[in-house]
């Protein structure tokens, strides 16, 4: 009985913490003059709490495993909603594909530039011009 209550407590604590970050993000988003989704701000809050080790990762692990395990199921309503606008998507297929391709290219270029900026060029041992 005690083990069952402990497992229930771990899952309950995980979901409460995840939802607390979500609703804090929604609240902060409602105060901002710029439109940023509250779920994104909530994820950033959760990330900061975990990165600074204010919130132990083991407290949110059980809830995260459940959400990741059933993630595909959570996308079904979105897919059904998109299919309601299939005619509109078919009419705008070209611009949608072009915008996806351009945004993918922009993300690729920005990430490669920022990676080069952060990591820099590394000298290889034995490379011409490297000091030994």
Curated annotation (Swiss-Prot):
The keyword Nucleotidyltransferase does not apply. Keywords: Cell inner membrane, Cell membrane, Membrane, Transmembrane, Transmembrane helix. It is a multi-pass membrane protein. It is found in: Cell inner membrane. The chain crosses the membrane at residues 7-27, 31-51, 63-83, 93-113. InterPro entries: LrgA/CidA, Uncharacterised_UPF0299. Its main location: membrane. One of its GO terms (cellular component) is plasma membrane. Pfam families: LrgA. HAMAP family: UPF0299. PANTHER family: HOLIN-LIKE PROTEIN CIDA-RELATED (PTHR33931), UPF0299 MEMBRANE PROTEIN YOHJ (PTHR33931:SF5). Belongs to the UPF0299 family. This is UPF0299 membrane protein YohJ. It comes from Shigella dysenteriae serotype 1 (strain Sd197).
